Amino acid sequence: MLRWITAGESHGRALVAVVEGMVAGVHVTSADIADQLARRRLGYGRGARMTFERDAVTVLSGIRHGSTLGGPIAIEIGNTEWPKWETVMAADPVDPAELADVARNAPLTRPRPGHADYAGMLKYGFDDARPVLERASARETAARVAAGTVARAFLRQALGVEVLSHVISIGASAPYEGPPPRAEDLPAIDASPVRAYDKAAEADMIAQIEAAKKDGDTLGGVVEAVALGLPVGLGSFTSGDHRLDSQLAAAVMGIQAIKGVEIGDGFQTARRRGSRAHDEMYPGPDGVVRSTNRAGGLEGGMTNGQPLRVRAAMKPISTVPRALATVDLATGDEAVAIHQRSDVCAVPAAGVVVETMVALVLARAALEKFGGDSLAETQRNIAAYQRSVADREAPAARVSG
C-alpha cells in the first residue's frame, strides 16, 4: 500500500518526505519536485518569506537516474535560513548562556486564536508555543508537495491522469461557478496572480487582498482540485473507510487551515430535489455518457469515469498583523497574540497543496486496484481492466451507434 509521512520543523535544518509503496520504473527527477515546490510559492498576497525561503531539493533514496526503484523514497528540502536558527532549533542541548541573548529564543507565551498554539501548549505541556508552531506551520506542506510529485508522475504515466487546481473565490469575491478547467489550462492558471481560471474574477480577488492588507488583516477562500482521465472503479462501496470520498475528505481536511471539503456540487446538492441532483446516463459511442457532473466524479465511494472535483475552504491565516486578543499563559493577563511574519492570503498556494493530497490518495487507490511491482506491470493490469470495462459498456455503445 502506498504510504507517506513528513518530518521536520518550519525553521529546522530541513523537511523530509518519505513515500513507501511506489512501483519501480516511474520517471521523476529532483527538477520535477522543484517545479512543483515553485508552484506552491505562487500567489498574490504571499509574505516576504517567499522571497528568501528557497526550496533546495535533495533526493536521498528510492530514485536512481530519474527512475523509482520500488523502495522507500526519501526527499529532503533544506532550509537556507538554517544558520540563523541553528542554535535556537538545535537537536542537542545548548548552554543557556548561549541562548540568553538570542531574540529568536524568547518564549512565545501569547497563543494566536485560530492556531495550534493554545491547545498544543496545554496538551504537550510546553511553556512556549515555539515547539507547536514549528511543526504546525504550513511550511510542512512543502514536504507533502514533494511526496505528491511522485504520485503525480505515477498517475500520469500509468493512467494518463492529470491533477490541477484553481481558485474559486477569495474573501467575499463572487465564486466561480462555470465548468472546470482542462489540463491545457494549467499554465494560464499558474500565470494568474491569484491562480484564477476565471479572468473576470481575478481583479476582484486582487482587490480583496489589497483591502485586507491595508487593514492589517488576512483572507481565506475556496479552491477546487480537478482530476482528469480517471477510470471507473477506484475506491469501493463495501466499507466506509474504503470509500474514496472519505479518503479524499480526510486527506484534504488534514491540510493546515482547511475548514471544509465538498465533492462535486456538495452542499448545493442538499438544496435540490433528487430529479435535479444526480447525473443521468445515456448510451454513447464509447459506452455510457452523462450531460452533467454534479456528483463530481464519485458515486458510492467510487470513481465513475467523470472528472473528479474536490473543493476546499481555507480559513483566513491565523497570524493577523493587527494582532488579536489572547491571554498570556505565563502570567494569565490579557494580551495581544504573538505575530510571526506571514502571508495576507495563501489561498492560491493552498490549491497546489490540495492537488498534492488528491494525487496521493488517487495514486494509493490506483495501486490498491491494479497492483504491480513495476510501472510496466501496473500498466498491463490497467489495460486488462479497461478492456473488461469496455466489454461491459459495449451494449450501450451499440445502442448509440
UniProtKB/Swiss-Prot annotation:
Positions with a binding annotation for NADP(+): R40, R46
EC number per UniProt: 4.2.3.5
Role, per record: This reaction introduces a second double bond into the aromatic ring system.
Keyword entries, A-Z: Amino-acid biosynthesis, Aromatic amino acid biosynthesis, FAD, Flavoprotein, FMN, Lyase, NADP
Pfam families tied to this protein: Chorismate_synt
Species whose genome carries this gene: Mycobacterium tuberculosis (strain ATCC 25618 / H37Rv)
Family as reported in the entry's similarity comment: Belongs to the chorismate synthase family.
Binding positions for FMN per the UniProt entry: R135, A136, S137, Q256, A257, G300, K315, P316, I317, S318, T319, R341
Pathway the protein contributes to: Metabolic intermediate biosynthesis; chorismate biosynthesis; chorismate from D-erythrose 4-phosphate and phosphoenolpyruvate: step 7/7
Top-level EC class as recorded in UniProt: lyase
Reaction it catalyzes: 5-O-(1-carboxyvinyl)-3-phosphoshikimate = chorismate + phosphate
GO cellular component, one term: cytosol
InterPro entries per UniProt: Chorismate_synth (IPR000453), Chorismate_synth_AroC_sf (IPR035904), Chorismate_synthase_CS (IPR020541)
Record's protein name: Chorismate synthase
Tree of life domain: Bacteria
Names of required cofactors: FMNH2
